[in-house]
Amino acid sequence: MAKKEEKENKSGDISLKLGPRLLDLLAKLQQVELEDFEMEVKELELRLTPAAIATAAPRAVAPPALPAKVKPTTILEEEFTPPIEEYPGKVREVVLGATKSEGGSRSKKFVIGGADTPSFYIFEKPPVHPPVVAIDTFDIKVPLPKAIRMHVEEVMEDPAEWAKMAVNKFNADVVTIHLLSTDPLIKDASPAEAAKTVEEVLQAVDVPIIVGGCGDPKKDSEVFEKIAEVAHGERVMLSSVTLDMAEAGTLAKPAKAAKEHGHLILAFTALELNNAKELNRRLYEYVPPESIVMDLTTAALGYGLEYSFTIHERARLAALANDPELQHPVLSGSTNAWAAREAWMKLGPEFEPRELRGPLWETITAINLLLAGVDIFMMMHPAAVKTMKEVIENLLTMGKAKPEKIADWVTVRI
């Protein structure tokens, strides 16, 4: 027994034995306070039985109630004024054709140009003058795609009848007569012969006309001089003069004749605005600016149409920015679309019918340049002409923006 107590003392553990009575008394108390008590121990370990009384948690405070969201019952009403930008410059107005009271014999004339906004900015203001559509005819029988030939085959050897058909059947605003017979490499027709053809066309139709040359700088100069004299007072457009004429020294002759007899000059350059400005500067020496129309070159769909669009758009914006050398109406030879083989050649069945593909090719070419700012179009296929005139009419009748309908721009149907 002594050994056991000794062992317990060596281990450092002390057991305090209390009687049952004392334990009962202690059970009724929540705390015990000892006075004059000393304890010498080497190591003290306290084991506390979990108390039955838990520390009370703080009382949760309810957050203040958020005010109820008020849902809008009406749309915010605010006045909207469409922005209208003013431009410092504008395109000059050019008159094509002359009526009897003006010294000519046309039943009507067309004012082209005059734009003071980018093309068809209807939300700013409608175009001053609607674009004009001319139909191409030729003074000799020329090879044409079947899709075109089938409509004009019966009149291809008679320029006057061809012009009549263009006006009476296909509703052309203007007729273009191309004098290909004057080409030295084709028939080399004389200026007098060419002038006679133009006279016949003037007598056959009463709309303004455009007279096209053969592209030879020397021959065109002679032909235009003669035609200007024969068509005195009719205010025809001579198509076209070029920088090649200036370099060949033949520009002065047709330009002086145009001024003397009251005609227009079509200034042709190939997709280069600097050249267009240079040619215009040279023409200013002979004719007033109000007699000049620009042809900046029309490249067909698939053959550089995007370049033509860019050049025409740049020319319009330059005119609005007050560049006087580019403030001239612009003409597009949209018939050039037929130079694209894809417009008429035989392809796979998925590209048929060719009779529809060709007119679409010409129409798309023309509409793109319409939106770039072209004022007058040379076209050929009757369906393309009809579609183009309808597109122009639809754009013109859209009217200005209606601010009161801004909120109704979309509807949903389920």
Where are each of the predicted segments found?
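Active-site mouth loops of central-metabolism enzymes
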Residues: 15, 19-22, 26-38, 132-161, ...
